[in-house]
Regions:
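Charged DNA-binding/catalytic regions of mobile-element recombinases
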Residues: 2-324
């Protein structure tokens, strides 16, 4: 079968002969989607020009030589226009250590005054080979059975709050290096996902949690505040409940072995570890270095890392904009 015998195709699909054959076998189908047919056809030709002759590709795609060269010039001009945008996308991606996908880069560009379609951001990131990191899950549990006082689940997975300090969340997570382990105990505000305060310790003891409470809740009274946790032994301890009672804070606990009940903390720990720990463990030379990196990340998370659910703002920006 010669080239002239091939059936011309609709704008939706094209049919190409297999390399080195006359097209007797079933040919690969390639979709022509988006933008103009001539522009997309030109892009396909540029992708396949090393495998087939230009004349063959032009005939199969029903594209004149003059139109092809015109589109090549247009694409080159468009590439020049996109160069500055690609450099900015790369800069944002690098600034956030490869943790931003196209959605958050789109929001960050909007915050900087650039109005660009999110699909274009996605397309340019693909060309640049930029992909956001995938989160890994590894759960640390401090549960040691029913050894103290428990509390009802007052949250029931209704995590969001209408104002700061209405619903707060806490938990402990573990970081393991060859030298030893660190334990992070933060308090997160359900209003804007801000880390109110935190402690880092070499051991997950009661002193760490007591210090965390004192740092996160320094005022005399917090009437109307709920502090939700899992059923870890620290949160069943009498001193924990005594502190909350004195501050007017109501305790709330997840059901036994049900980590999604504390989804706000689970989400934060997942973000934290995927963005500054998993895959980077060997880069930390000591526990002191890791501890400083955790503190630096939490500052970054609160003040710079934008969240889609906060309208493209960081937790502190969202709180400041809402309450001044």
């Amino acid at each position: 079968m010669g080239t002239n015998d091939r059936v011309r195709t609709t704008p939706e699909r094209i049919r190409l002969p297999e390399s080195g054959e006359c097209g007797a076998k079933k040919a690969e189908r390639i979709p022509i989607e988006g933008r103009s047919k001539a522009q997309r056809a030109t892009e396909i030709i540029q992708e396949l020009i090393g495998q087939f002759s230009l004349a063959t590709l032009l005939e199969i795609l029903d594209l004149s030589r003059s139109t092809y060269y015109y589109q090549v010039k247009r694409l080159a001009a468009q590439e020049d226009q996109d160069m500055a945008l690609k450099e900015l996308i790369q800069s944002i991606y690098d600034e956030h250590h490869g943790n931003y996908g196209y959605r958050r880069i789109h929001l960050e560009l909007r915050n900087r005054g650039f109005i660009v379609n999110h699909k274009k951001i996605q397309r340019l990131m693909k060309r640049l080979g930029l992909k956001a990191r995938i989160r890994r899950k590894r759960k640390y549990s401090s549960y040691r059975g029913e050894i103290g006082k428990k509390a009802d689940n007052l949250i029931n997975r209704q995590f969001s709050a209408s104002k700061p300090y209405e619903k707060c969340y806490t938990d402990v997570t573990e970081f393991a290096l060859a030298e030893g382990k660190l334990y992070l105990s933060p308090v997160l505000d359900g209003y804007n996902s801000e880390i109110i305060d935190f402690t880092v310790s070499r051991s997950p003891d009661l002193k760490q949690v007591q210090s965390m409470l004192e740092k996160a809740f320094p005022a005399k009274s917090y009437s109307g505040t709920i502090l939700h946790s899992d059923q870890g032994w620290q949160y069943q301890h009498q001193s924990y409940h005594h502190f909350l009672e004195n501050k007017g804070i109501r305790p709330s606990m997840s059901r036994k072995g049900n980590s999604p009940d504390n989804g706000m903390m689970e989400s934060f720990f997942g973000i934290l570890k995927s963005e500054m720990f998993y895959g980077l463990e060997t880069s930390y030379q000591s526990l002191d270095e890791l501890e400083q990196a955790i503190a630096d990340y939490i500052f970054y998370y609160n003040n710079k890392r934008i969240k889609t659910k906060l309208k493209g703002l960081s937790p502190v920006q969202y709180r400041t904009k809402s309450f001044g």
